[in-house]
Amino acid sequence: MQAFIYGCFIYDILNPLSCFEECILTTPDLQSNKPLLTRSVWVSLLLLGLAGQLAWAVENQYFNTFMYDNITPNPQAVSWMVAITAVVSTVATITMGTLSDRTRTRWGKRRPYIFIGYLVWGLLTAAFPLAAKFQPIAVGVFIAILFDSILSFFAASASDGALSAYITDVTTESNRGRVVGALEIMKWVAFLVIYGGAGIIIQAVGYYWFFYIIGGIATVIGLVCTPMLKEKIETDKPEGRYWQKIADTFQLSSLRQNKDFFKLMISLTLFMVGINVFFPYLMIYLQHYVKLSIINSSLVVGICILVGGIGAAYPIGLLVDRWGRKPVALLSVVLEAIGLTVFSISQSVPMLILGELLWLALIEA
């Protein structure tokens, strides 16, 4: 919102990368013992995080809205797109993340995936609305899902498979929390920009230019910031075999050794299933069932993100410190249910905001 068979494809194209060899530089720092988390790396990580979250928010919400508004109002099309891209992203994260662990190039093991991933991510975000040009409608739906699936593959490879692993590579226990926390802020900033401002942008320039702008931002930031990331060049041969490393993750012995962790993952999966049942349809619901304009829909969501997401983050953190994680997590489930119930039966803007605040404020708890 998190690397993939496109692994063979990446390996095939790594050799012809001479067209941007000058772009991805192998600096002396990469071979030295100097800290990798320099100021330029910090800035690059923040910008890559922001660009990724902007593009993800657009894909997660406005691809669906565009499909409904401009290709077909059949919600089945949106459901298929959400389901297929979720599977693609999951497979991509696992397979391409493992592949990046084993990659050895003069540019590092993570940067090629981040560079290529952000490039394709941005280009396909910009190209997505072209699906509406295809007729009949079934072909347009197919092209939209195809674009989104390819985009999701490269996006998950770049962000979840490679960038997340890169952050682990270049941080330590003493500074990892700050980096992750800063990237979390970038996520909320991106949410505020997209969910709060997208309606205004779309109203002013239309869907097509909206996608062109967001896609352009992701592409440019990927092209500029990825070469600024510093990475130690590894020459040792990767241990074990590729598919064996993936299989080891799902062995029964691994489940037994990490029992509590997998219980947590199962709980989180069930919780996120509930979230993703409704969240991809949020803007569609506000526009087509509550009958709010696209600007008013954006304002409702933007206010809730500003207050319930960004504003409530610190107080909830204090609450977690005082009560502990488990009580706050249980409270969040209860308030989520209440908030969604209020949201689903409300037709007035104040009640919609109240309901959304209840489920949004504790969604990160």
Indicate where each model-derived feature is located.
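Juxtamembrane intracellular "pre-TM" segments in multi-pass secondary transporters
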Residues: 26-38, 235-265
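Pair of pore-lining "gating" transmembrane helices in MFS-fold secondary transporters
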Residues: 35-65, 258-278, 357
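Glycine-rich segments within core transmembrane alpha-helices of 12-TM secondary carriers
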Residues: 89, 177-202
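Helix-to-loop junctions at the C-terminal end of transmembrane segments
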Residues: 93-106, 311-324
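Structural signature of the two symmetry-related core transmembrane helices
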Residues: 111-127, 327-342
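Hydrophobic core of transmembrane alpha-helices in multi-pass small-molecule transporters
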Residues: 124, 131, 137-158, 351-365
